[in-house]
Every structure is written in C-alpha cells, then in structure tokens.
C-alpha cells in the first residue's frame, strides 16, 4: 500500500495557455515538447482555447520547447515537484514573411464595390488588367488570350460578343489617378472585310492596354457610383498607381502564349515639410495566340514617368502631381506563309496596324488638416490624350475579268468605271483621336454633413485623315463608302456639374450613413439638328447604410452588422462614330451593254447616297438599384447583395429601308453594226423600277436587363495552419432584347424578283443567359520558408441560355414604294405574298439549354528569397478539373479542358 501511495504522489502534471505576446490572442494547435535529463519526451498541443496539459511527469528538471508557425520558438527550463501552471507567450517572428492579402476585399460601405491591393495583384501574376476580374464575385480565371481586345462586362452572364449589346462595356468608366480613359473618338475600322485584324469601335476600353505592375490598388464599383463620375452606365474602375519608394522593381513573366518584361524605379525625398517622389517604369509584352497562326499577334509597350510634391503649410497640405505616359502596340505584317501566298510565292494580302497613345496629366489639390474648419479640400485635375493610329492593308485582287464599278461621289446617273481583272489595292486608315479633360472639385464639412461639388469638361476630336484608298482600285468591289477625312467631324464637348452630400448620424445604438447626389450633364458641338445637342440629362443617385448595434455572441465575440441600399440613374453619351457615321453609297445598274468589242461597251448606273445619321439618337440610360447586408465577427466577414439594372435605351445597329427608283434600259433593240461607239441612252427605251434597299444606323434600340445575387466570405487566418479561406460567387441572369420594333425581310424570290415587302415586328431579337458561379480560395502562407501558395476551386454550378420567341405576326409592313401599311392578321394572311411575313414558330429553337456542373482547380505558388527581395512564382490553371460529359437533346456532349501554366521572376532591390 505504501509503495502505491508513493508512486501516486510522485506523478505530476503541467498545464497552461499559449498566447500571442503582442496582442494576447490565443494560439491553438501550438506544439509543446518536454524533455527530461534522460532525454525522455512527453508532448501535447494546445486546444481551440489555447490550453494545454501534460501529465505523467516525475519529479525533476525539464526543458520545455514551444513552437508555432510564424513565431519565435520559446525554450524554458523548469523544475517539476508538484502540479503547476505555466502560461507561455510567443513572440511573432518579425523576420519571417508578413501576411500577404492575396484576395480582393469587399468594401463594407453604402454600395457594392471591391478593392484589390498590390499584393493580390502580384499574386494573380497578371498579363493585363483583365486578369484581375477573376477576383470579383462571379469571376473566374481565364487564360490570357491577348490576340483580340479584352472587354469588361460587369454583373453579366454569358460573354460579350454582340455589338448590339456592347453598351455595358462602353459604359464602364476607367479612371487612372483621377484621369478618365476616353475612347469616344475612336473611328479605327476598315470599310472592307478581311480575315486580318479586328475592329472594336464603340466597345469601350480595351483592358489589354492597361499594365498592372504600377498599380497600387484598384476599386471596382459595381453598384451606385458617386455623382463625381459620369458618362457611364455599368460601373466604375478607379485605379491608383504607386508613388514614391526607392526600390528597383523588375518582373519577368512567361506563359504558354506570352512573355512580359517590366522594370521600374522609385525615388523619394523627405524634408521637414516637403515630400517629393518620382516613379518611372517600362513594360513590354509580346503575345502570340498560336505560333502557327502569325496573324493574331499582339505587342504592347508602356512607358510611364510620374512625379509628386507635397508641402505642409500651417494647416494646409498642398499636393502637385504630374504624369507622362506612353502606350503603344506594334503588329508586324500579318501574313501567313501557308495561307496567304499566291502560286508564285508572293503574299496575296498583308495587314499592319500601329497604335501610339501619349497622355499628359496633372493634379493640384489643397487639403485642410484642421477638421474644425468648413473648408476640407479643393482638387483640380487636367489631362490630355493624343493617339496616332494607323491600319495599312494591301491585297492582290483577282476578279477573273474586267468589272464595272461605281466610283462617283455625285448622286445621279453615271457610267461605270471599268477596273481590270487583276490589280493591287491599298487601304490606309489614319486616326488621330485627341481628348481633353478638366475637373475641379470642392469639399466642405460642417458637423455631420460632408458636401462635395464640382464641374467637369471633356473634349473629343479626331484629327485623322480617315480611310484613304483609290476608288478606281477598290480593296473590295462591295465597298459602300468613299474616302472621308476624320478631321472634318466637329469636336464634341461634354459639360457636367454635380453636387453630393454625405452624412452620418447616430440613431440610438444604430448609425445611419447616407449619400445623396445629383449630376447634370450635356454635350455640345453636334449641331442644332441633333436632339441630343445641349439636351440636359439629370442623374440622381442615392445610397444609404444602417449600421446595426453591436451584439456579443458566444465566447465574448463582437458581431458587427449592417444593411445598405442604393438607387440611381447612370448616363452614357453616344460616341463620335454613332453621331457622325460615314455616308453610304449604292448603285443600281440601269444599262449593262457588254459586247466583245471593248469600244462599244457601256454600263450605266444610278448612284444614290444614304446618310445613316440618326439625329434623334439619345444617350443610353441605366436605372440601377441594389440592397445588401454584411456581417463582421472576430476577423470573419460575410456580405450578400441583390441587384437589378434595366437599360432600355442601349445603342445598337438597326436596319432601315428606303425606296430607290431607277431606269431599266432595254438593249434588245441595239444593232451593234450601226454603232461606232457606246450606245446613247437617249436612243434606248426604258421602264421605271422601284427597289427597296436597306442600310444600318445607330439607334437606342437595345434593352439589357440584369439581375442577380453576389456574395463573399472571408475567414481570419487560422494560425495553426497559417491558412485563410475566402469564398465568393454570384448568380447572374441577363436578358438581351430589342426595345424598338425591327425590320425583317424574307429571303425569297417572287416572279424572278426580290420579295417586295418588309415586315416590322415588335420582338425580333432576344436571349437570356443565367449562371451560378462560386470560387473558394485556400490561401496558405509559411513564413519560415517564405512560401505563399493558394488553391482556388472555381465551380460553375450551371450556365444556360434561351432564345426568346420572336413576334409571329408583323405589326406593319413596307411596300416597294416605301409606304407603311398596318398588317391585318385575319385579312393579310390570306394574301399569297403577305402571308410570307408570318413567321413559323419552332418549339425546339426556343428551348432552354443548360450546361451542368464543372469545376476547375487552379494553383498559384510564390517563393520569397533573399529577405523577400526576390520572388519566384508559378501558376497553373485547371491543374485538376471535374468536367463530366452530359446529354443535350439526346446528343452526348463531351467536355475536356487543357491546363495552362506560366511562371515569373520578380526582383525588388
């Protein structure tokens, strides 16, 4: 009995809590190892409360070693002679890698917006700004295909490919350091079709042009933008670039289709009241869509020089900023040795384009640091952009025989020009867009009221020579335009004024934040005949947020929550191409006498000119509203919102029909033996004929209806694993349809002639798309090894589309003379010709088509070396995937994906 009692007395235990020495936070899963003098070991790990307990200890001296990722190891020597308590404090390892935020962060404000910091941008390893969009709710990783323009399409299901619904991209405003990117004077398109190049006039900002290495942070506003920003419909992208620093930053990136080189240097000087900075950088990108397909290549060169100077003077802070930037793209001649060579080895067509953009901007601001004063800040910005754009095309045209074409600029009857069967044709498009921007903004604060007001002026002009070609050697015989210089188009001016009030008021234990503003804007320069000229547009916008009382939940954690809502109009003005389209020329053959004797030939044509200008064109307006909620507790956050946007006046190309009367000369009475030259028209009998011909013009005929739910979740970093979980996603439903009646002409021949009627239909074009997308990112950082790696599981739970039924019956129709008649469903369907305007309804064409679940797993890895001065990074998209096959309409659809990878080396010295 005494021996058992002695054994029980000599066994002890030790317990305690492991905490962070800097903030006393608990550290779960810390490792505690105890070793006695005989090197016998006992160990334990701390639980979720940071507590540990080691039992079965004999009396003696022990060495206690405590380790935790990201903290200094603690070693203590302790004598055990009884049960004891030992609390352990671990100090963070300041030499190890600090936490890097590699995801976008949702702003918990009065509207839906996302902030992307420099660390997240670097971790994405982007080639252009478009790569950053995968961080938005509903976004997903895409391969950096740079052979065609990259367009933004916020809060939308489906891809943007139809120019009739491009207002969403055109109406997303990009702002860099307070200066907007404008492209409304872009007219760079070729009037003849070719498989070379691409024209994206009226599509908005090409995100390929924006390099990411100089970006400090970017805010993407998807909800209701401040009235400080106008000429937009869909969203705001506000980019702030780096200032100061003394590092040399170099980046080398290579992936399967592109190579990128960047080098930048910062300079910074500080004095007692003065701080000056200079930043300069150079970026070069070379992208190939496919090494075997040399036409689709794209190169980008950007150079930037930025400077700032800040002076503190009493309570005032004076800031002066300036920037000089250059962006160029260089495409060599796009000829393919396997596709574009004639029999003798010479190319049959070449294409060469160049784009050179220069920008100069400045900003001067005064800020009051005395918060008791009414005056808070006065900010003034000015910028100018000048572009030199050229497209040069050459083609060896082979028609097989001499061909008559119309080349006259004068309307009326003209003999055709006979062009040879084979010739060389050249076409040059010379564009010189020029933009000026000026803005002044005043901020006043009185109590809970913060008021900002200002005005803005924009000018657009194109000094280019336009399309230059020889009409007698046309690039294509189907060209319907004539050479027109761009510099004859008048300059356009946008004038805006705005006022906005922010207020925050405590209501009991709640607080209310509200922002209400009004923007007045108009354009001038188009001329009195345009309805839009000097027409005022008002954009009222309001957002509100209610911060609910804090609540204490289990374990003493504080829960913060809030509700927000917003509504507002957003307006986008038409571009220069929409307001001043090129005149169209058409011709109808009246006489075609083509004997074997060349001296007797004569082809007479009626030349007519169509002005596709729509003087009734209006600005596109989008009504947006949203409601949302967010939660924040102990480093965890969650937000969700529902939104709806309805733009019923989007820009699109619509068809219009006109009636053209021409002569038809009868050549049967011509006696060739009596001719000494071409026949005289006065000697020939003729009959009159009327032809319906169509042309395209810009109208406010598109409706885009967006609705959806966006959500995001962020955990705090789990210290035991040094891992953070982030998730976001969205359900989008987007409807596209025509909002004004459209024309449709059956493609049939009646009595050897084209069908004589054109139907006018209420619904002629419509589709809707929907999708549910989620993205779970697992971000792990190992400071001791200098490693950051993230795994994202991007799930497309479903996507689908449906073509909406078109109108079966027309509401009216046009006859050959151009007269409009109402369509009688009971009477006209019995008419043999008119009943062809009744369209058949095929059920299978309007079935909903759904694509089922698919998941891609993407990996990004960064290794820091030499005190974080060198980084080696790797990314692999679709390293794993789940893309099961599925059946659609009884047919098996097989799916497969291909991994895409790239790597980069980054220096910060």
What name fits each language-model region?
Residues 19-23, 30-37, 67-71, 81-122:
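Short, acidic, small-residue-rich periplasmic hinge/interaction motif at the N-terminus
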Residues 85-89, 129-132, 151-153, 175, ...:
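N-terminal periplasmic accessory domains that precede
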Residues 130, 134-188:
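Extracytoplasmic beta-strand/coil segments of soluble accessory domains associated
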Residues 179-221:
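Short acidic/polar hinge/loop motifs at secondary-structure boundaries
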Residues 215, 249-286, 292-385:
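Transmembrane beta-barrel wall of Gram-negative outer-membrane proteins
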Residues 311-329, 351-529, 708-710:
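Face-selective signature of the C-terminal outer-membrane beta-barrel domain
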Residues 508-509, 646, 664-807, 906:
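Gram-negative outer-membrane beta-barrel transporters
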Residues 647-649, 794-841, 851-856, 860-909:
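C-terminal beta-signal and adjacent terminal beta-strands/loops
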